[in-house]
Amino acid sequence: MKQRISALDLLLLARELKQDLEGYRLSNIYNIADSSKQFLLKFNKPDSKLNVVVDCGLRIYLTEFSRPIPPTPSGFVVKLRKHLKAKRLTALKQVDQDRILVLQFADGHFYLVLEFFSAGNVILLDENRRIMALQRVVLEHENKVGQIYEMFDESLFTTNNESADESIEKNRKAEYTSELVNEWIKAVQAKYESDITVIKQLNIQGKEGAKKKKVKVPSIHKLLLSKVPHLSSDLLSKNLKVFNIDPSESCLNLLEETDSLAELLNSTQLEYNQLLTTTDRKGYILAKRNENYISEKDTADLEFIYDTFHPFKPYINGGDTDSSCIIEVEGPYNRTLDKFFSTIESSKYALRIQNQESQAQKKIDDARAENDRKIQALLDVQELNERKGHLIIENAPLIEEVKLAVQGLIDQQMDWNTIEKLIKSEQKKGNRIAQLLNLPLNLKQNKISVKLDLSSKELNTSSDEDNESEGNTTDSSSDSDSEDMESSKERSTKSMKRKSNEKINVTIDLGLSAYANATEYFNIKKTSAQKQKKVEKNVGKAMKNIEVKIDQQLKKKLKDSHSVLKKIRTPYFFEKYSWFISSEGFLVMMGKSPAETDQIYSKYIEDDDIYMSNSFNSHVWIKNPEKTEVPPNTLMQAGILCMSSSEAWSKKISSSPWWCFAKNVSKFDGSDNSILPEGAFRLKNENDQNHLPPAQLVMGFGFLWKVKTSGNEDNGDDDEEEEEEEEEEEEEEEEEEEEEEEEKEEEEKEEEQQQDEDDSNEVNGLEKGGDSNDSTKNNSFEHDNLEKDIEKHCTISSDTDSDSGNAKAKNDNSSTQRILDEPGVPISLIENINSNVRGKRGKLKKIQKKYADQDETERLLRLEALGTLKGIEKQQQRKKEEIMKREVREDRKNKREKQRRLQALKFTKKEKARVNYDKHKSELKPSLDKGDVVDDIIPVFAPWPALLKYKYKVKIQPGSAKKTKTLTEILHYFKSRPLDGSSTDNEMDWPQEHEMIKGLKEQDLVLLLCVDKLKVTIAGQKSTKNGGNSSKKGKKKR
């Protein structure tokens, strides 16, 4: 089975992935269950979502099927998420003439390198191509964290990869002649002859190991692939077979076929060019027949097992047409790989079960054969003992003679060894009695072994039986040939001679007569027959137990949870909310959060729709796209949802909801026209409320079936774009929340830093000052020097008489600004200058005159000697940072204000999302009819009256059971209901429905339940008790 993509496959896949993925954002990265080398990359952008499967070193492709994901990611995936999550894929390119794919994120800030040669690797690089993380460490290449990755450079993305295009174009224009092919083969022949000469010289010199060396000649397939490596190995092999050339044949044998080889290469090159340039993409899958397939038992999809995939039509020999088939897949080549691997993974479980069943059947057959062998052994023992008993009776006189002869020697008190030597001597002399005895004698147990020939009576009996059978055969088949008759007579004569020569050893007890010895054998036969009956009886029970045990093991393995690949279905827009479809076909929605409530109102609610609420501040919406009167049953069902989703469920309060038309609802405050908080609405006219009777808190859980309808496959949901816009808005809101949290953290850090600095300055001041008087003097001296410094920078106009007050103020401001620009002036003094303090200007003039001759160097030296220069620099740096942070906060504030204005526009716009509600009604069915093609199963949590037409439903009421336990019990109940194998009775469950229910997991259904603490009521069973076991009876009264 093909597991690794070839160089041609990667070239085609890279082009498709570049076209499909560039511009998408990587939303998340996951491990795929049962493999640490497989990864799932999820990309999205406002109008679509794409999933990419990466198997390290083996394959990469877009998939339309879901993959099982482990609960916790690996360390490598955590590293990838940290750097690549939410980054945009800006470029995707393949390294020239190499099986390396490079994904560029965030305009070159990060690179994800996928290697598909050898064992493969996945490497994360930073903007300088420095390795940040590796999927596996390869010592041969010395790729380590912190080193520069050298398999590509910046030119791969900066030069638009012109070199790669040039090499591809060069390969595309290549032409091959018979002279060129002849040169290749001649070069191989010359190397072969030189190697032969070297080996002969080694043989002449008598060096060891020379005879063991063999000169290998490359096959024609290997030679062509080494000369034209850009052509795929599979493509060359296919075309060699088309030209009736064995790919494994030696290239030296085709020295006279250079013309056909050149034609083969040119046709292969032409096919290669067509694969790269064609826009009509197709893929092909070669499947082979499953040897374990049983048509009466297995499903049709197990008849053939996928073996290989190619971008070209594979070649099948004429004799393999029955055992192989070619499946053509229309569309991009990614779709071919997705179908190939997804089908293999989906059928892997079924094939495993099929293999386990065959192994179980083999175990049963082996056990049955072992039991048959035991019974046959008992039958053989009975037959042998019966024959021995009859032989002893027939040869009773002979047996007595042998007994008397041996007994006479024993009576003479001869040594047992001497007796055996005497018998051996008599056997050589031809003594008839001695020849019947088997040595050694078992005199210790007073027994001897005697060899008896089959009696003439038994021979006559067997011959009579043969004659009778021959006579019967002749009567029944009078047309038989005379030659067959003669051959059967010859066979019977040979068998009689063989039987006459056959001897049987019989054990004789010297203490018993011949007939008594025969009785012993008949007793053994009787005991064996009784044992046979017991064995046969026990065998029947044992076989039944073995079959039951194996059947239980198979059922247990079938019940074990296994991951089933499901095609990713685009969810309906209302599936992200709490929803149900009423018994009259009206869509009822409720947001799971205040933000979702606002989304429903702004995106989908129109004036003729219904708004429903209650005293617990729950909000439910009823869509009325046809603008008809909403039936009372729908209002009642929506009221049940409204009350059940509130605190009334946990408190078990039966209250009355109320409703009004959506045109009576506003999102703006009536006084200042500002937007109300999330999830809050205002009624324009309080008198338009319509109260309903108290709602019963009875919900239910059931299944809807999405079936294929006309145009179902071609037309997607009309609201996908709206959904993506909502997701973008949610992402923006999350970003704003994160920014606000970051601002709070920064402010807290600044306050802590400021406090620490103030504390450290106070401590330093106490340490340096010595006492309070000295510190006061130093501070006053420092202050005077700074004032003198400032005076130097101040420029006072000499024409004081002509200056007006405004001019003076202006001059003061300009001078102050110039002082502020100097790096060495404290900001606190500058701010004090601007304050109108009496006598300040005169003091500044004196300072300016006093330090008029002081240059910049002397001033800085004085400040450094005083120790105030560093403090001034820190203060200025802090001021700059505060200004920058203030600007960032202003930008964020403006962004949030802009978002609020957009939100206000969202609530005021009249255009709503366009949704085909009739299409949804036709696709979703509460029960299946014969002939329906099911796309998917959709679980629903809805009021019980809305589920009365559903085939699969259970009642849920307030209780104390947990959600997961309740869902487990519900799914177990649905799976254990009886089935209608023919799928004709609409009232009974169908196998197809149970197969889809088995794919559901409790964890995926928990979010559907908008209530907590449940009590489930299942038909024909006792309802789940509140809080587990009932309380024990109270103690007896004293």
Curated annotation (Swiss-Prot):
Ranges annotated as biased composition (Polar residues): 795-805
A family per Pfam: NFACT-R_1
Modified residues (Phosphoserine): S797
Keyword flag Kinase: no
Domain of life the protein comes from: Eukaryota
GO BP: CAT tailing; peptide biosynthetic process; rescue of stalled ribosome; ribosome-associated ubiquitin-dependent protein catabolic process
UniProt cross-references to InterPro entries, sorted A to Z: NFACT-C, NFACT_RNA-bd, RQC_Subunit_NEMF
This protein's UniProt keywords: Coiled coil, Cytoplasm, Phosphoprotein, Protein biosynthesis
Impact after mutating K534G: No effect on protein abundance. Decreased CAT tail synthesis
Signal peptide: none
Coiled-coil zones: 350-383, 713-768, 830-912
GO CC annotation: cytoplasm; cytoplasmic stress granule; cytosolic ribosome; RQC complex
Location of the protein in the cell: Cytoplasm
Biased composition (Acidic residues): 714-761
Stretches with biased composition (Basic and acidic residues): 780-794, 877-894
Stated role: Key component of the ribosome quality control complex (RQC), a ribosome-associated complex that mediates the extraction of incompletely synthesized nascent chains from stalled ribosomes as well as their ubiquitin-mediated proteasomal degradation. Thereby, frees 60S subunit ribosomes from the stalled translation complex and prevents the accumulation of nascent polypeptide chains that are potentially toxic for the cell.
Family to which this protein belongs: Belongs to the NEMF family.
Quaternary assembly: Component of the ribosome quality control complex (RQC), composed of the E3 ubiquitin ligase RKR1/LTN1, RQC1 and RQC2, as well as CDC48 and its ubiquitin-binding cofactors associated with the 60S ribosomal subunit. RQC2 binds to the 40S-binding surface of tRNAs.
Miscellaneous comment as given in the Swiss-Prot or TrEMBL entry: Present with 7700 molecules/cell in log phase SD medium.
Protein name: Ribosome quality control complex subunit 2
Lineage: Eukaryota, Fungi, Dikarya, Ascomycota, Saccharomycotina
Gene this protein is translated from: RQC2
